[in-house]
Amino acid sequence: MTDSTRSLRNCLAPAKLNLFLHITGRRPNGYHDLQSVFQLLNWGDTLHFTLRDDGRVARVTDVPGVPEESDLVVRAANLLKAHTGTTAGVDIEIDKCLPMGAGLGGGSSDAATTLLALNRLWQLDLSRTELQSLAVKLGADVPFFVFGKNAFAEGIGEELAEVELPTRWFLVVTPRVHVPTAEIFSDELLTRNTKPVTIADFLAQQNSDAGWPDSFGRNDMQQVVTSKYAEVAQVVKWLYNVTPARMTGSGASVFAAFQSKHEAEAAKAQLPTGWNGAVAESLNEHPLFAFAS
């Protein structure tokens, strides 16, 4: 990342994985109570921010299928302007890397990186807690990325506690299919009564590499998604021939963990022709963590 008084360039918006995802209940308002562990990855979209003197917020790169006015990065910047009253403006460039609708948190991470970067570039000095209170207005996953550490999440995803995770390499395979999150959450076959677990339960298991991630929990959405989307089912089945694998979020991406980059790259090299796979190392902290206190 490069930093000047007029711009912040090469700001990573890291992807996330749900190492497990349990649905423990459903609220009267339709929202679901969840438990999950969020893992940051050293892989994601790259954003660039340049000050404008006219006060405008402008996205200067096209993102296919995402109108500028509804883009989370533009909404995040405008939300920050409205909250603080700053007269500063910004040009935002986005180098998209993460597939959309894949369960990797791409749009949410872009929004969080925007909040953190503009907190620095606009010299706002908002606290992390204050930024998280804004982030929740943009989406359920955005507060996690502002939180900036690997986390045990509860509630609807807004109750976060830092969790220490070992360094691992991941192979993430994304089928060429978009899985609508709302469709999966509304499916009558979705498990909604998984018994709650604790951080201690998770930590006792995740330090053992044998069979991980199968050694703890599951993704309650995976069975519904694989029954509806054959492409996701094919990836899960193929990866299981190599190593234990699991879907992240509501899909469609599926991941497997390895002890080394070499092992992950070797598995990627075996992927069937035309499959989209990426190798990424785990992160302990968001690259812009220091931009809020």
Curated annotation (Swiss-Prot):
<dbReference type="InterPro" id="IPR004424">
    <property type="entry name" value="IspE"/>
</dbReference>
<keyword id="KW-0414">Isoprene biosynthesis</keyword>
<dbReference type="GO" id="GO:0050515">
    <property type="term" value="F:4-(cytidine 5'-diphospho)-2-C-methyl-D-erythritol kinase activity"/>
</dbReference>
<keyword id="KW-0547">Nucleotide-binding</keyword>
<comment type="pathway">
    <text>Isoprenoid biosynthesis; isopentenyl diphosphate biosynthesis via DXP pathway; isopentenyl diphosphate from 1-deoxy-D-xylulose 5-phosphate: step 3/6.</text>
</comment>
<dbReference type="GO" id="GO:0019288">
    <property type="term" value="P:isopentenyl diphosphate biosynthetic process, methylerythritol 4-phosphate pathway"/>
</dbReference>
<feature type="binding site">
    <location>
        <begin position="99"/>
        <end position="109"/>
    </location>
    <ligand>
        <name>ATP</name>
    </ligand>
</feature>
<comment type="function">
    <text>Catalyzes the phosphorylation of the position 2 hydroxy group of 4-diphosphocytidyl-2C-methyl-D-erythritol.</text>
</comment>
<dbReference type="InterPro" id="IPR014721">
    <property type="entry name" value="Ribsml_uS5_D2-typ_fold_subgr"/>
</dbReference>
<dbReference type="InterPro" id="IPR036554">
    <property type="entry name" value="GHMP_kinase_C_sf"/>
</dbReference>
<dbReference type="InterPro" id="IPR020568">
    <property type="entry name" value="Ribosomal_Su5_D2-typ_SF"/>
</dbReference>
<dbReference type="InterPro" id="IPR006204">
    <property type="entry name" value="GHMP_kinase_N_dom"/>
</dbReference>
<feature type="active site">
    <location>
        <position position="16"/>
    </location>
</feature>
<keyword id="KW-0808">Transferase</keyword>
<comment type="similarity">
    <text>Belongs to the GHMP kinase family. IspE subfamily.</text>
</comment>
<keyword id="KW-0067">ATP-binding</keyword>
<dbReference type="GO" id="GO:0016114">
    <property type="term" value="P:terpenoid biosynthetic process"/>
</dbReference>
<dbReference type="GO" id="GO:0005524">
    <property type="term" value="F:ATP binding"/>
</dbReference>
<keyword id="KW-0418">Kinase</keyword>
<dbReference type="Pfam" id="PF08544">
    <property type="entry name" value="GHMP_kinases_C"/>
</dbReference>
<dbReference type="Pfam" id="PF00288">
    <property type="entry name" value="GHMP_kinases_N"/>
</dbReference>
<dbReference type="InterPro" id="IPR013750">
    <property type="entry name" value="GHMP_kinase_C_dom"/>
</dbReference>
<feature type="active site">
    <location>
        <position position="141"/>
    </location>
</feature>
<protein>
    <recommendedName>
        <fullName>4-diphosphocytidyl-2-C-methyl-D-erythritol kinase</fullName>
        <ecNumber>2.7.1.148</ecNumber>
    </recommendedName>
</protein>
